[in-house]
Amino acid sequence: MTLLKSYFGEFGGMYVPQILMPALYKLEIEFLKALNDLQFTNELSNLLKNYAGRPTPLTLCKNITKNTNTKLYLKREDLLHGGAHKTNQVLGQALLAKKMSKKEIIAETGAGQHGVATALSCALLGLKCRIYMGFKDVIRQQQNVFRMQLMGAKVISVKNGSGTLKDACNEALRDWSENYCTSHYMIGTAAGPHPYPTMVKKFQSIIGIETRCQILKQESCLPNIIIACIGGGSNAIGIFSEFIKDKSVCLIGVEPAGKGIKTGKHGAPMQHGSTGIYFGMKAPVMQTSEGQIKESWSISAGLDFPAVGPEHAWLKHIGRATYVSITDCEAINAFKILCKLEGIIPALESSHALAYALKLISKDTNKKQIIIVNISGRGDKDIDTIRKIDVYKE
């Protein structure tokens, strides 16, 4: 029996081999103890402030919205140490692993941002780490692979399946099944078996807490709309968390439509998947009628995932959040616009959220509204990808 709720409505659960159940129960207990341990919370707060660089700014875009009545703010997780929001929850999990006397960290990564965050936290806290990464992602994210290796991580290229994030997740879970006594599995998103979705949300909620304080200080009111990209869903649930109770705030998650929904090459399980069992949870999944997992597709490695976290599924089910999709081309266009008009280079993942914001703004330029987009990471890692794409030619 779990101490916290392990389901969000019908979504969630602990669909793992029986051998891992004691490890998950133990993790839940230690997580709850840590939250009530002043030494732990103070140490985490200190690391977030003095090591990671929190709070991150809430930046008003002054050029993109010229000649409109929209105020567009960006929550700047790209400025966090490590280059993305991943650092928030990785520091929390790494401290928890130390508290549990674990010696090694196992992780998976797609875009490499979670891998980089894992590597830097392990270097800081003296933990060994091995990081699984699909071979396709190793090729397209070579800069992040080298960053991980510089910080002492062992990066394991996964050649099984499609060689992307889902395959890295499978291998990491398999590794943990064999080494759970000495290792902690540091899941990188708000998905997986309980208690991971709840734990990751808690450590990422700092994004929403800061955003709420910042927008109230700058505008003396809440935003009309908050938009975040959705892969597994950690950056989105982090910023959504403090606004779920505010029904006046529209919450929008943006999935990757890839090369177009009709092509089948996308990563949009919320809109075009069905409920299934994957990665230790019950959630929307891209699957065949026989329950076989389909290959997802996105130009952004961090969104190239065939499922989504259970709380997002529940938020959609109850009508509290809306989920849409943006194609590769639309994301690339938004990437270029932010670079050229505001001097900010966003991650391709975040560019999906920005692209949808630009769509909303262009629909009615006279509408008075405040929109916040979570810029979940910086785009240094994506420069080579953008440079090679024909659509970037002027």
UniProtKB/Swiss-Prot annotation:
Catalyzed reaction equations = (1S,2R)-1-C-(indol-3-yl)glycerol 3-phosphate + L-serine = D-glyceraldehyde 3-phosphate + L-tryptophan + H2O
Output the InterPro entries linked to this UniProt entry: Trp_synth_b_CS, Trp_synth_beta, Trp_synth_beta/beta-like, TrpB-like_PALP, TrpB-like_PALP_sf
Q: Which cofactors are required for activity?
A: pyridoxal 5'-phosphate
Top-level taxon of the source organism: Bacteria
User: What is one GO cellular-component annotation here?
Assistant: cytoplasm
Q: Which Gene3D superfamilies match?
A: 3.40.50.1100
**Keywords of this entry:** Amino-acid biosynthesis, Aromatic amino acid biosynthesis, Lyase, Pyridoxal phosphate, Tryptophan biosynthesis
GO molecular function term, any single one? tryptophan synthase activity
List the EC numbers from the record: 4.2.1.20
Pathway in which this enzyme or protein is active: Amino-acid biosynthesis; L-tryptophan biosynthesis; L-tryptophan from chorismate: step 5/5
Function as written in the Swiss-Prot or TrEMBL entry: The beta subunit is responsible for the synthesis of L-tryptophan from indole and L-serine.
HAMAP family per the UniProt record, alphabetical: Trp_synth_beta
Family the UniProt entry places it in: Belongs to the TrpB family.
The record describes its quaternary structure and partners as: Tetramer of two alpha and two beta chains.
Q: What is this protein called?
A: Tryptophan synthase beta chain
Q: Which organism is it from?
A: Buchnera aphidicola subsp. Baizongia pistaciae (strain Bp)
Highest lineage ranks of the organism?
Bacteria, Pseudomonadati, Pseudomonadota, Gammaproteobacteria, Enterobacterales
